[in-house]
From Swiss-Prot:
A GO biological-process term: protein folding
InterPro entries in the cross-refs: GrpE, GrpE_coiled_coil, GrpE_head
Protein's name according to its UniProt entry: Protein GrpE
Alphabetically ordered keywords of this record: Chaperone, Cytoplasm, Stress response
Subunit and interaction comment: Homodimer.
Localization annotation: Cytoplasm
Family, per entry: Belongs to the GrpE family.
Biased composition (Basic and acidic residues): 18-27
Amino acid sequence: MSEQNTNHESPEQNVAHDNIEHSDSILEETMKEFDPQHNSGEEMTIENEIDLDTFKARIAELEGEVKEAKEGTARANAEAYDAQKRMEQEADKSKKFALQKFARELLEIVDNLERAIENADANDPVAEGVQLTHKALLAVLHKNGIEVVDPQGEKFNADLHEAVDIDAEAEADTVGTVLQKGYSLNGRLLRPAMVRVGQ
């Protein structure tokens, strides 16, 4: 009798046994699902999915940082280029106009030489020497970017000319007499010409 009991399980025992087997198979499937070695190809575990999302987020973050770094480098390069250009322009301006004060003082010498030439006797050998000196000085000034502004007969320009009197014989708004020549340094006015202007 006891042998029959051991060989034949009751219906309740069969159900319990089936339930245990079913639970074991579910557990085994669940373990396989979370086992990275078991999952390959298109199968994804929740854990792997979480890791992949984290990984993608980190990649996006790093790409953003790289983009910011590239933009920062481009801005820094542009600023450095602009600064270099500004320095070159400033150096160029300094070269062009460093002699401005010195040149103005030289103009007084030119004026004195011109007055001496006007008042000298044409046959005087000293006057000839003064003329040669005047010519040589003007050549040096020209070589260094200093040009004569002699507006005789031109339209009056307040930016280039200084009107000190009226010339009754000249046409209206026209320079009649140049009392003192003007000069420019590399295209920039160094001294305006003193003139008489027609009304």
